[in-house]
């Protein structure tokens, strides 16, 4: 059984139909771009493993390359899980340690004389990884697949020009709990789907839910009520209560603040004398 599942009927998903739809979408985008090879950064987590499985479903395992990019503080189990996922789906994969690249930047977690900064040091890791992914994509004349989900997209829980950078985003429309349903259907390794605590591994001991301050099932339900249904915090809480989901108005306010405060991350960079682009999450 998956670690998380949607808790409101509006978020229930037909995995077989969804996989077919995403695979068709991916094939279309690669055909438009005139490319054949997909490059996927594989962390050992559910999002990247699911993205890998979808790429194989769409393009065939011979056209998918996985890159596993640990650094000094990456738990060994993450590398093992990533390798297991790559082997489960039968794709070519490479493991490259990025520790020395991070050290060359003089980040605080690697250079004792520099204080560690959660914002700059932690965000450097996904940005370095994205550089490596695009290097390989250029070498292979391929496209980089993003591994971010809708929950991360709406809350801004991603690094600009890091894990937020990609050529195609096949699971950006799926909430985190929906990703687990798809992962289970695709055959992502059981430990990743059933047991593993979601974490961006930005620093030792970091977890997604600890940083966000709310569990994923409740967060997804609140996001759906606030964004997709367009309800205010009080009405969102009442609406969820009718569906058996307990949440507080304080929770709803906090989630809405995450959406609003991260809107700049979802818009293209503004330019002088250009219309201010709308936040895709808050329009329509």
Curated annotation (Swiss-Prot):
ATP binds at residues 41-48, 147, 176, 199. GO terms for cellular component: cytoplasm. Pathway: Cofactor biosynthesis; NAD(+) biosynthesis; NAD(+) from deamido-NAD(+) (ammonia route): step 1/1. GO terms for molecular function: ATP binding; glutaminase activity; metal ion binding; NAD+ synthase (glutamine-hydrolyzing) activity; NAD+ synthase activity. The keyword Ligase applies. Residues 275-284 have a biased composition (Acidic residues). It catalyses: deamido-NAD(+) + NH4(+) + ATP = AMP + diphosphate + NAD(+) + H(+). GO terms for biological process: NAD biosynthetic process. Mg(2+) binds at residues 47, 152. Its EC number is 6.3.1.5. CDD domains: NAD_synthase. It comes from the Archaea. InterPro entries: NAD/GMP_synthase (IPR022310), NAD_synthase (IPR003694), NH(3)-dep_NAD(+)_synth (IPR022926), Rossmann-like_a/b/a_fold (IPR014729). Keywords: ATP-binding, Ligase, Magnesium, Metal-binding, NAD, Nucleotide-binding. Residues 264-284 are annotated as: Disordered. Deamido-NAD(+) binds at residues 127, 167. Transmembrane segments: none annotated. Gene3D superfamilies: HUPs (3.40.50.620). Homodimer. NCBIfam families: nadE (TIGR00552), PRK13980.1 (NF010587). Catalyzes the ATP-dependent amidation of deamido-NAD to form NAD. Uses ammonia as a nitrogen source. Belongs to the NAD synthetase family. This is NH(3)-dependent NAD(+) synthetase. It comes from Methanopyrus kandleri (strain AV19 / DSM 6324 / JCM 9639 / NBRC 100938). The lineage of its organism: Archaea, Methanobacteriati, Methanobacteriota, Methanomada group, Methanopyri.
